[in-house]
Amino acid sequence: MSKLLVIALLLLPLINHGIYLATAWDDQDFFKYCPPSKCSQHGPMIRYPLCLESSNTSSSSSCGCAGRSIWKLACSGQDTILVHPVLGPYSVSAIDYRRSSMKITPLVDPCLVLQQKLIISRSSSSPQVDVINDEKPSFDENFFESSSATIVHCSREFTPAAAHADSIAGPVSCLSNTTHFFYLVNSDEDMSILPLDCKVVPVSDRGGISLPHMLKDQMFYNFTETAKKIPSFAETAVSWDEGDCRECELSGRRCAFSSQRDREFCMPDPHGSHIKVIAATSSVAAFVALLLTVATVLYLSLKTRYNAEIHMKVEMFLKTYGTSKPTRYTFSEVKKMARRFKEKVGQGGFGSVYKGELPNGVPVAVKMLENSTGEGESFINEVATIGLIHHANIVRLLGFCSEGMRRALIYEFMPNESLEKYIFSDDSNIFQNLLVPEKLLDIALGIARGMEYLHQGCNQRILHFDIKPHNILLDYNFNPKISDFGLAKLCARDQSIVTLTAARGTMGYIAPELYSRNFGGVSYKADVYSFGMLVLEMVSGRRNSDPRIGSQDDVYLPEWIYEKVINGEELALTLETTQEEKDKVRQLAMVALWCIQWNPRNRPSMTKVVNMLTGRLQSLQMPPKPFVSSENELMS
């Protein structure tokens, strides 16, 4: 809360200042008669002590633009122009009134302008500079910070002595040639420092060329640096004579001019009814900004604390987990392993999956947990459930990374991706050629054996809660492997019912009891239901919500398959099937219909499912309708 108090104290002056502006000035408004102006919508604002060239003489006089040492700017189309009598026109891109400076860029090469004005007499070796009034007198040399430069013509090149190196610049490359060498010399210097063959080039009616002081990081260049930069074709900053306006502008007010008193004065910026509205608005905006700042700081503080708690929870788990396999990697190792995450091969519920390679050349899949929820639960679930088990039908976890809030899981790579790719493919040839009845049975049996191991073969029972085609990966030989244990839950092997705070899984595969306890308690039978829905999709090649089933758009997939089986109709999608293949598909469908019984007590265990699929049960009875019979049974 101390941080919030500091921020509030910092913003309170802003609010007070807005209130002050709304009431501080109720006098004749200078800006009402001398409003700021622009040459274009995005051009710099032009206001006192600068003036825009205007034909309105009376307005110029009352606004302090007539007969005073100020810069007068002009508009040329959309550009704001400042004209130098010798160096030519400049475009003004920005004006900073608080620092009394502006950024200017030559519209034409200053050196070229100077060349055109430099007249070398054919009969004399003494050049002259013609600066007779061929430009508008918009550049008052008494107004800006400047140095006077004298143009010097020499018959040979020379190097200034070290004591005078800051006062002599040249030779100016764009003016000089093999017989004429031109230098710019600070007019404050005695010309006796020059070689005898050097002559001053006369400038009409002037003692020299006025070079505006160039700024860099609010520091003035010295004479030599300025003289070298002036001929360059680049944007630069120049400063004008500050006078009394600088202190006024720095205090947050505006410099103005009183025509009656013929002097400058300082006033709020601006004032009157218009500023009252602006000030009131700014006060409200400042208050809103304060609230947003407080809310942001509070959010970031809570988020930081939340992330720290998650990090501590994960680290405590990993400390308890020990140093046994899988291997823990640093994030830099994971990034190198995944080739900087260039090859994305999939997207899961908790993050993206990238193809990578271990240092020994073994291909791997790297899952970056981007949307991990439940206080790091998905990461902990994955490591805790499959980190120490090894089964032919469960994807193997080879390593992991937990570094700050960045977490990754490294699995064995499955080249044939997920089962979903094949059973829902728009290319019917894929389904017909790869997922023939024999292969369908092998895949279903492999999944069933993997689930049986999770439910019965480990020290603790592992409930997956997200069995679906997307989470069944296929290896080189199309052997299935169960993956994605982000929603998994561990429980004792003798624990029949587990407690959940919310339903888990994917719509279409979630058992009824996860939605309503009227169907019974949540147990490993929820996974059996998901397996049944998966197998129904395998034998039909369609999603359980696919409207293309049958002739009616609203036919429920289990109901459609049940009617097919009970009426002895074919389910296989291959063009030609033997009677044996038809029987295998029918067997798969009957097992699936047993698995999706609404009453969990009527569903078989995965051990019994394996026996059903292997034919160990001699007579497989037709199950009751899972969507009618079970409901009636539960209601009776």
UniProtKB/Swiss-Prot annotation:
The active site is at D466 (proton acceptor). Glycans are attached at N56, N177, N222. It is an enzyme of class 2 (transferase). Residues 1-24 form the signal peptide. InterPro entries: Kinase-like_dom_sf, LRK10/LRL21-25-like, Prot_kinase_dom, Protein_kinase_ATP_BS, Ser-Thr/Tyr_kinase_cat_dom, Ser/Thr_kinase_AS. It is a single-pass type I membrane protein. Keywords: ATP-binding, Cell membrane, Glycoprotein, Kinase, Membrane, Nucleotide-binding, Receptor, Serine/threonine-protein kinase, Signal, Transferase, Transmembrane, Transmembrane helix. Its EC number is 2.7.11.1. It catalyses: L-seryl-[protein] + ATP = O-phospho-L-seryl-[protein] + ADP + H(+); L-threonyl-[protein] + ATP = O-phospho-L-threonyl-[protein] + ADP + H(+). SUPFAM superfamilies: Protein kinase-like (PK-like) (SSF56112). One of its GO terms (molecular function) is protein serine/threonine kinase activity. The lineage of its organism: Eukaryota, Viridiplantae, Streptophyta, Embryophyta, Tracheophyta. Residues 25-276 are extracellular. Residues 339-628 form the Protein kinase domain. It comes from the Eukaryota. Specifically expressed in the aerial parts of the plant. Belongs to the protein kinase superfamily. Ser/Thr protein kinase family. The gene is LRK10. Residues 298-636 are cytoplasmic. Its main location: membrane. The chain crosses the membrane at residues 277-297. GO terms for cellular component: plasma membrane. This is Rust resistance kinase Lr10. It holds the Pfam family PK_Tyr_Ser-Thr. It is found in: Cell membrane. ATP binds at V345, G346, Q347, G348, G349, F350, G351, S352, V353, K367.
